[in-house]
Amino acid sequence: MGKFPSWVLVADWPPPPGVMALSTLRDGPGVSVAPFDRLNLGNCSGVAGDAPVCVERNRSRLVQMLGLPSVPHWLRQVHGVEVLRVDVLPQSIARVVEPTADAAVTSVAGAVLVILTADCLPVVLAAVDGSEIGVVHAGWRGLADDVLERTVAALRTSPECLQAWLGPAAGPQAYEVGVDVYAAFVERDSGAACAFSVTRPGHWYVDLYALARQRLMRAGLSAVSIYGGGLCTISDPQRFFSHRRDRRSGRFATLAWIGC
């Protein structure tokens, strides 16, 4: 699959045969200007605040410079739990309406799945034999509403034959939340309390990585098959966009595909 440029973070897992997973960094060869500099891949609807033409150009450059096997299946993410199954390759590079979903799965070689984030947790799932992949946008709302479990269930591979990579997200020493987030997890599962540490009355730091590991293991993955974590989008402004840190922020992409 070749060597990737410095503005790409390749998944730190034992890659399944033919599977590639990576996240882009903000300092890639994009055309966006501050505060979206440089490689902002955020929604062309303008949700991220960047000029749509800049996002379009950045997406085109991404495909060309990474030599992707096809145009990525961009999603309209809404912090929901809808899982899109991709059964065909895109027929052209023409812009199409992005389907509303927060996860996607495929077994089609050459189909590029993509998730956009800027603090939420991107998760890549793959069959250990390389036959199937999935990507998930797992913010706290999605995690609480079982988006990971739903994506595992949407895959045709048995959970014990899956592995996962947890991409860059807001870290457990920087992501402070209130009672609403704490209650969304702990009221349903007291074991989730270990992913929260008190900062001040009514506020906690939350460990999205720990919550995701709990959810994935509950869905049937083994602990040793879950990789990644340890990064923090909030505290690393040189590499990552962060909505929590900057408010007006771009989005980076986490992509996965099965080689043709």
Swiss-Prot record:
Alphabetized UniProt keyword annotations: Copper, Hydrolase, Metal-binding, Oxidoreductase, Transferase, Zinc
EC number: 2.4.2.1, 3.5.4.4, 2.4.2.28
Keyword Hydrolase attributed: yes
Classification via CDD domains: YfiH
Family per similarity comment: Belongs to the purine nucleoside phosphorylase YfiH/LACC1 family.
Catalytic activity entry: adenosine + phosphate = alpha-D-ribose 1-phosphate + adenine; S-methyl-5'-thioadenosine + phosphate = 5-(methylsulfanyl)-alpha-D-ribose 1-phosphate + adenine; inosine + phosphate = alpha-D-ribose 1-phosphate + hypoxanthine; adenosine + H2O + H(+) = inosine + NH4(+)
Residue sites binding Zn(2+) per the record: 79, 120, 137
Family annotation (Pfam families): Cu-oxidase_4
Function statement: Purine nucleoside enzyme that catalyzes the phosphorolysis of adenosine and inosine nucleosides, yielding D-ribose 1-phosphate and the respective free bases, adenine and hypoxanthine. Also catalyzes the phosphorolysis of S-methyl-5'-thioadenosine into adenine and S-methyl-5-thio-alpha-D-ribose 1-phosphate. Also has adenosine deaminase activity.
InterPro entries listed in its UniProt record: Cu_polyphenol_OxRdtase, Cu_polyphenol_OxRdtase_sf, Cytotoxic_necrot_fac-like_cat
Cofactor: Cu(2+); Zn(2+)
Gene Ontology MF: a single term: copper ion binding
Name of protein: Purine nucleoside phosphorylase PD_1754
Subunit details: Homodimer.
Source species of the chain: Xylella fastidiosa (strain Temecula1 / ATCC 700964)
